[in-house]
């Protein structure tokens, strides 16, 4: 039971059905007994509601690319190799460690951390596009780590560093950090090493050297995949080959945010506002 993230709307706790013993086995139920507010109801079921509307805004969002598809990057099986979303949970005060960034296997503070950029993105075998937010997310997380553990050494393996607009100031700030090293090169392999460490194999594109480097923890900057790439809606929505919405306005359906393309928070908010205004204009014009 946890609050999904700090800005969740509504800002209430939820039960994770994949982890809840009561929902999985029918046994336990201790949470319901100790909840003084009586807020836990294990018998609550999904409800189907039918309504008619003059316009629809599709803001179905995105999901991280499934790391199990990335065989060369450990396929989610290498210990202490986490995704950027999992690291975000570790850094969250509402997360399992109360905001402490530690190794999942033993709770130790990592002294060497590597970030692997474009984990699934810009790859014709996976996501054939740039996910837009991954570089900025990594730069943000590098700052998390530098603030919490100034002595921890960080390596960032990248194809290209993309910091659009004024975000370049963040890139310059992280580059100036003495404990952060940027290595241009596409990671070829992530494998288990001794003591639950992780070995990264990469070719340094600048020096032309093949490197085998060990880290206490590795973070995969997994790509952004539209939810509709794997989950369908009962709507006449034209999708492109990657699962992003292409059109639908003539039917009164307006896509917003990452349902249309990879976007950051600010541009997602702008896209949502624009879609809502178009929907209002459509209803008023009828």
Where are these regions (language model features)?
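Residues forming the flavin
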Residues: 1-286
């Amino acid at each position: 039971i946890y609050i999904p993230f700090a800005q969740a709307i509504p800002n209430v706790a939820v039960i994770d059905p994949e982890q809840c013993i009561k929902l999985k086995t029918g046994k336990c139920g201790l949470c319901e007994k100790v909840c003084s507010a009586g807020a836990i109801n294990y018998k609550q079921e999904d409800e189907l509601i039918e309504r008619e509307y003059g316009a629809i805004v599709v803001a179905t969002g995105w999901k991280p690319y499934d790391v199990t598809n990335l065989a060369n990057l450990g396929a989610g099986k290498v210990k202490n190799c986490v995704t950027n979303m999992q690291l975000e949970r570790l850094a969250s005060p509402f997360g399992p460690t109360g905001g402490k960034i530690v190794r999942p296997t033993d709770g130790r503070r990592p002294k060497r951390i590597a970030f692997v950029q474009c984990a699934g993105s810009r790859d014709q075998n996976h996501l054939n596009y740039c996910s837009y937010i991954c570089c900025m997310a990594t730069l943000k997380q590098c700052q998390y780590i530098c603030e919490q553990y100034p002595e921890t050494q960080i390596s960032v393996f990248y194809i290209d560093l993309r910091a659009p607009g004024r975000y370049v100031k963040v890139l310059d700030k992280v580059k100036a950090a003495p404990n952060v090293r940027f290595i241009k090169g596409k990671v070829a392999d992530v494998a288990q090493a001794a003591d639950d460490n992780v070995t990264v194999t990469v070719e340094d594109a600048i020096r032309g050297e093949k490197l085998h480097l060990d880290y206490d923890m590795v973070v995969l900057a997994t790509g952004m995949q539209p939810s509709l790439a794997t989950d369908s809606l009962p709507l006449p929505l034209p999708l492109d080959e990657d699962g992003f919405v292409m059109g639908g306005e003539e039917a009164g359906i307006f896509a917003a945010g990452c349902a249309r393309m990879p976007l950051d928070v600010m541009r997602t908010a702008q896209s949502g506002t624009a879609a809502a205004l178009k929907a209002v204009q459509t209803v008023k014009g009828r």
